[in-house]
Amino acid sequence: MFSIFNSPCVFEQLPSFSQPLHSRYFDCSSPVSYYPECKRRKAIKANLRAPKKSDANCSEPLRYALAETPNGYTLSLSKRIPYELFSKYVNEKLGELKENHYRPTYHVVQDFFGNQYYVEDEADEDALLRSALKDLDFRAIGKKIAKDLFQDYEIELNHRGDELSILSKKDKIFKEFSLDQVFEDVFVIGCGVENIDDGSREKYALLKIGLVKHEEEISEGGINEPKMPIIESKIDESHDDVNMSESLKEEEAEKAKEPLTKEDQIKKWIEEERLMQEESRKSEQEKAAKEDEERQKKEKEARLKARKESLINKQKTKRSQQKKLQNSKSLPISEIEASNKNNNSNSGSAESDNESINSDSDTTLDFSVSGNTLKKHASPLLEDVEDEEVDRYNESLSRSPKGNSIIEEI
C-alpha cells in the first residue's frame, strides 16, 4: 500500500504532535497523530478519611447476647460498623452494578486521510446510577461486611463441653464463657447486619452462634414419658383399617420422640432461625408501611388545612377590597352634595349683589365656578336711554358730501 511517509511529495520529516489523552477535540493541523481518546467514565468513590492514630490502637467493643431455644442456646455477637467502611462496600457494589448495566455505544469518526475510528459515546452516569440503585441489595452487602469483620474470629468448645472461648487477633479479644450445661457442639448459624433496614447511621454487624445440647439431655423427656399401649383387637375386617391408621400414627410419634442427629438438628435450627428472621422482617416492613401511611395521611391533612386557610384568607382580602371600593364610591357623592349646598348659598348672595349694580351694557353674564359645578347668572335688563353723542354723530353723518373725490377731466 502507498505510505504517506515514503511519498515523493514529502521532502521533510513530519513533525510529531503530542496530543493529550483527555483532549476531546479533533485537531485538523495534526491529522497523522490523531487517535481515539481513552474513555474515562465517572467513578464512585467513598469519602474516606485519614485514619487517626487512636483508631489503630483501639477496636470497636464487642457485645454479647445469649438466648435459649428448644434445641439449645443461641449466642449473638455484635460490633459497630464504621460508617466509612459501610459506604466503601456500598460504593464498590454500586460500581459493579453500573459496569454490569453499562451497554456501550459507538460512533464512527473519520480523519483527514479517510481513516475511520470507532469512538465510544459518553454514557449517562445518572441513569446508570439510578438503574444500579434499583438492584442494590443491602442485605447481601451487610452479610459480606459481617463476614469480613468476623473473619479472624476463632470459636472453640472445650472437650468437656462446658466452656466456650472466642479469640480475635485483629480486634484483640479473648473471651471465655463458662456454661452451666454440657453442650455437644458449636456451629455458626449466620451473619449479617442487625439494623440494615432503618436509616440510622449506626450499623451493627451480627454473628449468631448455635450451641447444641447433649443428646442425653434432649432425649431425657422422651425416655421418661410412658408410651401409649397398643390396643389389641380381634381380627375383624371392619377394624383392620382403624388399627392400621392408629399404628401408623404411633410409629410417627415414636420417630418424632427419637433424638435427632447433629446434622438434622443444625439444619432444623438454621431453618427456624431463617423463619424467625423472615417473620421479624415482615413485621418490620408492616411497621414501616404503617408509619409511611400515617405520615402520608398527616401530610395530606396538613395540605388540606393549608389550602383551606389560604382560601379563607383570599375571601377575607376580597371582602376588604370590596368594602374599600364601596367606601371610595360613596365619598364623592357626599362631597358633591356638600359642594352643591355651598354653591346655592353663594349664588343667592351673588344675585342680590348683581341686582344693585347698574352698568352700561345691556346684559352681563356672571359665571361662578365652585367645586365641580358651573352656574350662569344674568343681570336684569336696563331701560333704553337716549344718548346725545349718538344724535350728534348721526347729524354730522347726514351733512357729509355724497360725491366722489376724483376730479373729472374738463
Curated annotation (Swiss-Prot):
Localization in the cell: Cytoplasm; Late endosome
Residue ranges the record marks as coiled coil: 243-330
GO process terms (BP): amino acid transport; intracellular protein transport; protein folding; protein localization to nucleus; regulation of pH; retrograde transport, endosome to Golgi
GO-annotated cellular components: cytosol; late endosome; nuclear periphery; nucleus; perinuclear region of cytoplasm
Any one GO molecular function term: SNARE binding
Signal peptide extent: none
Keyword Coiled coil: yes
Bias type Polar residues, positions: 364-373
Domain of life from the UniProt record: Eukaryota
Keyword Coiled coil in annotation: yes
Protein name from the UniProt record: Protein BTN2
The organism of origin for this protein: Saccharomyces cerevisiae (strain ATCC 204508 / S288c)
